[in-house]
Amino acid sequence: MALAMSFTSCVRENLDQCPPLRINIEVKDKNYFNVDQTVPDEKRNENQSFRSFVPSLSYRLSRLNDDGTQQVVVEEKGFGVEGDGLTYPVSFDPDMPFGKYVFTVWGGMKTRGELNLDKNELLLHPEHSQGDDVYQVCDTLVYDENHYCYTSEMERTKGKLVIWTENLPAGYHLMDTEVSQLYGIVNPSFLYSEETSVFHESEIEAGVKTKTSIFLAPSFQKDESVVDVNFHKNSGEGSSLSVLSPDDVKVSMERNKITVLKYVYDSDRNRFTIYMKVNDNWEEIHGMILD
């Protein structure tokens, strides 16, 4: 439905005081959709402050013209969120013309390199890194004498891969993980594009159960993201097996969902048994195929 717009001053002149456009920014995805079935110990109290979920923000308010083009009115880049409020309120100049506007917010980024404002898109895995746990929202709204207070709910752009390791032999303290077939870019409307991969290194502790978490964009194709994990010995510890390489595993990463894998080393057979957590149960994987 087309929304009528008025940029004339007659209506505003009849008002004692023009109400400024006010937007409360909230966090919608405070927990992952499947946190209870995957890593329940990571479930967060949803009454924590806004900044505990989204510590930094960038936002843009643009006027939406009749021809569909946008004109940037206000833009704030990469600032830290202060205070302990559950929402982050934004208020604009009360002299701003009535009309139709587009409000876009990005949050959680530690580096500006992830956000390309010129192209209005977010780079999900800069230089093949996991990047940050980034949120965004984009709302189209009407500002007039009757409509001036809105709420925008930020949603998570990525999912998370959790990898458990058990019974690694002594000396193996480094794990590298490469995940292919992931989306590389997302626009404010949550349309994902381009293909990329992620490479991640993490220190682990041999002989004990260790957990590693990696933020990952949704899979480029369902069930086609390949997880390639390798375990390395510290230099100088010497062994005929300096690298342990389990079989590759195919997964399907999704936005705001957790995928959990477990690699259990069997020293007697010199091999790994790999499991995926499905509906709160561990299912064994054979040759990329779930049992």
Language-model segments: which ranges?
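Structural motif
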Residues: 27-51, 164-171
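Tryptophan-paired
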Residues: 51-114, 173-253, 286-291
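Hydrophobic, glycine-enriched assembly/anchoring segments
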Residues: 259-291
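Conserved "repeat-terminator" motif of extracellular CCP/Sushi domains
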Residues: 151-158, 219-221
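Structured interaction patches on ligand/partner-binding surfaces of diverse proteins
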Residues: 80-83, 110-149, 236-269
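Bacterial Sec-dependent N-terminal signal peptides
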Residues: 1-39, 256, 280-291
